[in-house]
A protein has these predicted regions:
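Signal peptide-proximal N-terminal region
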Residues: 71-73, 79-114
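Solvent-exposed, acidic/polar segments of extracytosolic/periplasmic ligand-binding ectodomains
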Residues: 58, 371-428
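Short beta-strand elements in bilobed, periplasmic/extracellular small-molecule ligand-binding domains
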Residues: 102-119, 178-181, 230-250
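Extracytoplasmic ligand/sensor domains, especially the bilobed periplasmic-binding protein
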Residues: 132-239, 293-295, 304
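Short, well-structured alpha-helical segments in soluble
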Residues: 117-136, 251-264
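Extracellular/periplasmic ligand-binding modules, especially the Venus flytrap/periplasmic-binding
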Residues: 92, 308-366
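Bacterial N-terminal signal peptides that target proteins for export
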Residues: 6, 28-41
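N-terminal signal peptide c-region/cleavage motif recognized by signal peptidases
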Residues: 49-51
Length: 428
């Protein structure tokens, strides 16, 4: 019978200490083994040292605006569904940490630079500073006017830099106002509306009472909802304007029971409220017992902190540990922008920025977004293809595209504007 020490020696490849030799093998001198271990350790340490010396630093800038109304403390405290609850820098920093191992193997160190514009006029100086730092990857955490200004100025100022929109759902930025180097990780308004319409059609809740606010953003939401409703066979039984006001003469415009009581045909109440303040008062306050969707109740979102598949819990926990708050859709969009930069750097470590852009926008590079399939950017408008979660405050109850929704090429292109519908004419 083979002595236990010999079995251990065979498994570990280290000769046994003391006792009779195992089989016919000659014992290896201890000093020789010490020398081998010492050589291996030095080689390993030398490899780390070489990697550290040879690492190429790549900086990704996160550009935000001081005093951005989206981040007013009162708004963030209320945490309206579909609205940001913190700056994009948190998501990008987590992406750099998550990608460190593969980047290190490629000899790259990803550095995140936080750039806060004092006002819109500060963009020119910020771009000059970024040019001096040789930055060519930018994540934009900006309102629409400042994002458009950045997208127009960045190519010339930063040598063709790639700009990621990680926070705005404006369809125009993917359409007539698109740019060749502008990629979108946050889903478009049309994508969110299509996801919601797919779910309503699947549940056969086809008759919707629409409550629409007075803001320009509410009108844009209505445009997207009506487009999606026509696409998936939904019908608006009536559209009622709402208004939050202290004027006693207009009090009825903010009364949910009055707004929902006269229409008896609807199967669901769709709230189109880009601000979010009115929408939060609608669930469980309708005259008839009906589900509420849109800006409250059942909400279409790119991420939910209680997503339980595809590594979602691990991602949400890592983010919450670092940022001290739950991960929202805006945080996920910032994180996936950072991951996209890391992925293209690993796949094409020596490629110039123009080649990286082509590889991302309609090219072979795809990113793991912890939502199931690997995600890629559409060639025609730079939008990231992605599943959309249908969720409420306590979890995810559906994922679009839903089963049964078909597309001749890519089922995720059923969300938002397909190539034939796109008004974007800018290509890399």
């Amino acid at each position: 019978m083979t002595p236990p020490r010999c079995l251990l020696a065979a498994r570990s490849r280290i000769p046994p200490q003391g006792g009779a030799p195992c089989g016919l093998a000659k014992p290896v001198p201890r000093e020789l083994w010490k020398g081998l271990w010492r050589s291996a350790a030095l080689a390993l340490l030398g490899g780390f040292a070489f990697s550290a010396i040879a690492a190429t630093k790549v900086t990704i800038a996160v550009v935000s605006l001081d005093g951005d109304p989206r981040y007013a403390p009162r708004r963030m405290e209320k945490a309206y569904p579909g609205h940001p609850t913190g700056r994009a820098i948190d998501g990008v920093q987590l992406a750099a940490e998550d990608s460190a191992f593969e980047l290190d193997a490629a000899g790259i160190e990803l550095v995140v630079k936080d750039v806060v514009l004092p006002n819109a006029a500060g963009l020119a100086k910020a771009l000059a500073d970024l040019k001096a730092a040789k930055v060519q990857h930018v994540v934009a955490d900006l309102p629409a006017p400042e994002l458009r200004a950045l997208a127009q100025a960045a190519p010339a100022a930063l040598g063709g830099a790639i700009v990621f929109n990680a926070g705005l759902d404006d369809d125009a930025l993917r359409g007539a106002q698109c740019a060749a180097h502008l990629l979108h990780t946050y889903p478009s308004r049309a994508m969110l509306a299509d996801a919601l319409a797919q779910y309503l059609a699947a549940r056969n809740w086809r008759k919707a009472l629409v409550l629409q606010g007075p803001l320009p953003g509410d009108a844009l939401q209505a445009e997207a909802f009506n487009r999606a409703a026509k696409r998936y066979g939904l019908k608006a039984t009536s559209t009622k304007p709402f208004k939050l006001t202290g004027d006693p003469r207009e009090r009825d415009l903010g009364n949910v029971r009055l707004l929902t009581g006269s229409d008896r045909e609807h199967e669901v109440v769709a709230v189109l409220d880009s601000d979010g303040e009115f929408a939060r008062t609608v669930p469980y306050a309708t005259q008839l017992p009906r589900p509420v969707v849109g800006a409250a109740g059942l909400v279409a979102t790119p991420w939910h902190p209680l997503w339980e598949r595809n590594g979602g819990p691990q991602l949400s926990r890592r983010f919450a540990k670092d940022a001290k708050r739950p991960m929202t859709g805006h945080d996920w969009a910032a994180w996936i922008a950072g991951r996209a930069v890391a992925t293209v750097l690993v796949d094409l470590p020596k490629a110039p920025i123009a080649q990286q852009l082509k590889a991302l926008r309609g090219g072979p590079v795809a990113v793991d977004g912890f939502k199931g399939p690997r995600l890629s950017f559409r060639a025609w408008d730079g939008q990231l293809r992605q599943p959309i979660f249908l969720s409420h405050v306590d979890g995810v109850i559906g994922v679009a595209p839903l089963d049964g929704v078909l597309h001749p090429k890519e089922v995720m292109d059923t969300l938002g504007f397909d190539e034939a519908e796109s008004a974007c004419r800018q290509r890399p």
